[in-house]
């Protein structure tokens, strides 16, 4: 074999698994615990510095623990850790534990938003965090966001505004008011069968209101409702019978047997109202149990009209008819025992034979009805409405009954002189500028659309004035859910002082305008939030195929002085540039976005099957925003992508190993490109990536795998005039298990665990340490000297020496 003699300019190009013939010069088979540098060449990595053991009771962390670092300032740097049962916070500079809600020893997760016991994933895979200034948003990817159905906007008051728009001589102004009043009264009729003939008893009344049971079909003769059929059933002495119940409007009929249980209809809807009760035996035979009693309970409407007159007068009759197709009436009238009315004595009843085919009705002349037997049917106006007048305005308010009513204005000027506002109007111009403070009304938009309807509330110029001049301001629809359930929202962890954290749920602004159609909740409602991001002064969440960005701004203070984010519109009459953004990706495949990373002026979205870009024009607004697919490369969502400078790095599965892609915008073609940077080491990085971080100042990327948790796989790169001149892979090995790490400036912080006991500690590695560092003891060992004296007392009497 001939001797090959060549020169290598350096040995900084790192590991390559390619054949020797295709490798670049300066690459090697293995590089362990060295650092590649275009300035210093190949140098040994710096040693670790012990900071402190975690926890007074020796905190243990497994590879499933969630770890997140917080870089508040050069003097305050923290790490938050969730080991599956508790959330801890520590200062990585001093090693001191930080309090959470004023308590040391960790925040117990059980029964809270941080409880991951029901998740099929570990705490590491279930939790995600994003830090913005002094606040950290913590996401539980197994928790569904819900709404708070207990907190709703007030129901609409049953009141109307009546105002004179135009006055004229000898013109008539009037109102038609139609309404129901008071509590319905009821009566009972006991009917006793004495023979086997078939009878159907029918019942009529003025205007019943509520429903217990009913249905069927029939016809109306005057004010009397007749039955044809209604099939329902009951069991009487183990025999099934048919019950015929008539049809009417707003009535309540209850049928009960005196012996073996209750006979009742099955349909209680207002559309199927029982008026006539009849019984038929098996095989079409008629009941022949002598002494069998049927009880009918009928509820009647009490409806006084405005001014004291009744809508249905007290002459409304309750009549009982006997129906037989071939015979005249055969009932023993003496056995119809009583009619019991509330607060009234029992009146007489009329018994009329009736031919079911409608050919003839035989009635006596002495039809007697209820005739004042319900003493409270007529009620005074004052009990039903109150009136308040100020100037040309009358406020008509429903009384204690609070039931709905209809009102219509009439005038002698073609309907343009007297105005009425009740529940809704056709246009905002239909509303007076002199009204009751707090009066709310719906303003209809396009008749074919519901999304353009909106609601307004009157505010007097003088807030202490009940009725007066003022203006109409937009408000929320009545009886509308206002906000999300606080306990289902992500956590917001605030750094309130040195080594102090406050934990609370994210506050969201309650819905203040519109309704479920014009201002729906964000699309994360009823869904699981996957991740969070902060982009162009908007807090964002990714959920399914949607990206949701809050109202522009760093949140806002509410009336209580508390900080909150708004995910609803502030007006539904127009679309504002600052309004929240809720947009879905454009893709022909099922897409589940799990991460987002800002890149220059755009937001890059990552799904398992592709990447998307969210962008707007000069301003990001609901009108200018768009989301489009840009690349279709696989992404492993076990860890979030890492943004370093103008590049984004993200992992993907490469068989039983892991590959890394470098995502960037090509400045020449203005096209996004995703380049694999592990082409020379396809079998180097193990799978099951747990943590992924990088340093912009050191052009360094670090990767931790659960399959090799005592090694960090490192990638060092360097660009010169848009050309990458260094692309070096290597690894750093430790005698401790690495649970998490983070690059902050030129320092690498690691959370490590004893390889045997899993007792955890904080250590750090300076990346550009030159051997001289203030605050470190330096001692030169000469000759046979075996001892030295330390000027400090290390915690736990454990000392790590950096030997050089």
Task: Describe every region a protein language model picked out.
Residues 1-95, 426-531, 535-593, 652-672:
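N-terminal beta-propeller domains
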Residues 135, 158-165, 308-523:
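Long, charge-dense tracts
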Residues 92-99, 109-172, 366, 379-413:
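Hydrophobic or amphipathic alpha-helical targeting/insertion segments
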Residues 84-88, 143-144, 393, 538, ...:
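Loop/turn residues immediately N-terminal
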Residues 617-656:
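Catalytic or ion-translocation cores adjacent to nucleophile or general acid/base/metal-coordination motifs
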Residues 185-320:
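Conserved, function-critical positions that sit in or immediately flank catalytic
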Residues 4-61, 71, 654-804:
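Beta-sheet repeat architectures centered on beta-propellers
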Residues 60-75, 119-132, 522-535, 585-600, ...:
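Structural signature of eukaryotic scaffold interfaces centered on beta-propeller domains
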